[in-house]
Design a protein with these regions (language model features):
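Basic polycationic patches enriched in arginine
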Residues: 78-81, 101
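Conserved ATP-binding subdomain of kinase catalytic cores across diverse folds
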Residues: 56-60, 65-70, 97, 102-334, ...
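Intrinsically disordered, low-complexity proline-rich tandem-repeat tracts
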Residues: 71-73, 85-87
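An alpha-helical support segment within catalytic cores of ATP-dependent transferases
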Residues: 179-187, 335-368
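Catalytic-loop of the protein kinase fold
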Residues: 368-371, 375
């Protein structure tokens, strides 16, 4: 599958993406722009051999979200603008009337498809079908979601374990295996059906292959942080076993993104949120009068794990200082807004105002933090707490999530949880 030359292929691919659980544009008008294949992971000549593995490669779908009504043509200088943000409503303009109708290009998203090609229908992959068409290399084929095809998953894992670098004139796929990867390509792949934004494949009881679906250009934060914490010897996170990067050309620009990662599957793990709720239920059901929550010891251990991670992040990434006066101004504004919405809080305003005012003459330390820390981002294992999902707050931009912040943001997030 490639390009936009065949409308039937484009329609099939767009239908598959828009119906997927991980598609973020539901309810919006979406436009298929292109589909860019990365190099084959398998030899094309092997595809025609009896009982051969399926043809496998990664492909990048570019989608756009145009306005409800098609705008006037965008001048060339504007069309090259690289800002993908939503246009601001109601902004003033001094342009002449004919220029005032020009708007920025519609926002663009890139979706990652791991594709398994087979020459004939596969009885166990009916739900994974993406499209049927004639491929210039392979002839008539059926394209399936590789995440649901165990044979295709093994092809991907073998490429990762081999540290392969695959190149074509306009694209590249790079496989990076960690020095100590506790998984092998013969583990039984099993699709995890509960995930929304990405796709995870369980690799036996040892590892998880996580395919990123809506791509963020640049290095994925979850990979970046796990790699740094593993290198620092931190045991409070899962082991990173490897990751996959892709490069392709769109609109004359080379784009890069992380496509997938393989991470340790944490045996015997319990969700932190459920553990805390169960602790409270047990305490309330008990006839004994307790002065300390049964979860207190777990909470203390979780705090120590977070502190260890903060210390390692401070050593691994850049740090900076910010004006306390700016932080004080922000917090006072939030406090006043909270008191306006809930007048019962007004009695606390004077005391809190005094606390915030004390920040005005300070310089506050900031560093890389988790950024979206709550009980749902924690797992309790037999060996202790593990903290997961370092991609930051989803509503923020990549630059905002990567920027240094106060460690107390993570503490506040956990207390709120």
């Amino acid at each position: 599958m490639s390009g936009t030359a065949d409308p039937q292929v484009a329609d099939q691919v767009l239908r598959y993406i828009s119906n997927a659980r991980w598609f973020a544009g539901k309810g919006r008008r979406v436009q298929f722009r292109s589909l860019t294949p990365l190099p084959w992971l398998t030899e094309v000549s092997d595809f025609f051999r009896p009982a051969a593995a399926p043809g496998v490669r990664f492909e990048i779908a570019e989608l756009a979200y145009p306005a409800e009504e098609d705008p006037e043509p965008i001048p060339e200088a504007r069309a090259e603008r690289e800002d993908d943000s939503e246009p601001t409503q109601g902004s003033a303009s001094s342009d002449p009337p004919e220029m005032a109708r020009q708007i920025d290009p519609p926002p663009t998203e890139y979706y990652h498809l791991a594709v398994s090609y087979r020459p004939a229908p596969h009885a166990e992959l009916h739900q994974a079908e993406i499209a049927r068409f004639t491929d210039p290399d392979l002839g008539p084929v059926i394209a399936y979601d590789a995440a649901q095809d165990p044979d295709a998953c093994r092809v991907i894992l073998n490429a990762l374990l081999g540290g392969r670098r695959l190149r074509s004139p306009d694209s590249e796929a790079r496989f990076n295996a960690a020095a100590e990867s506790a998984f092998s390509a013969d583990l039984e792949p099993r699709l995890f059906t509960g995930q929304q934004s990405n796709t995870s494949v369980m690799l036996g009881e040892s590892a998880i292959l996580k395919l990123f679906r809506r791509l963020e250009l640049g290095h994925n934060l979850d990979i970046e942080v796990h790699a740094a914490l593993n290198a620092a010897g931190i045991s409070d996170v899962a082991g990173l076993y490897g990751w996959i990067e892709g490069s392709w050309v769109s609109g004359g620009r080379q784009l890069d993104a992380d496509l997938a990662m393989v991470i340790e599957k944490l045996a015997g793990a319990r969700d932190g949120w459920e553990l805390a709720l169960d602790s409270l239920r047990d305490e309330n059901a008990s006839t004994k009068i307790t002065t300390v929550s049964a979860f207190a010891a777990d909470a203390e251990a979780l705090g120590r794990a977070l502190a260890e991670i903060h210390h390692a992040l401070r050593s691994s990434f850049s740090t900076t200082k910010v004006l306390g006066a700016r932080t004080a101004m922000i917090m006072i504004g939030r406090m006043q807004e909270a008191a306006r919405i809930a007048p019962v809080l007004a009695q606390y305003v004077p005391g809190l105002r005094g606390c915030f005012d004390e920040l005005s003459d300070e310089m506050l330390d900031t560093q890389r933090v988790h950024g979206d820390f709550h009980l749902g981002q924690t797992l309790r294992t037999p060996s202790g707490w593990k903290i997961i999902d370092f991609e930051g707050e989803p509503a923020k931009t990549m630059a905002e999530r990567r920027a240094p912040d106060s460690i107390w943001r993570d503490v506040a997030g956990m207390l709120r949880s």
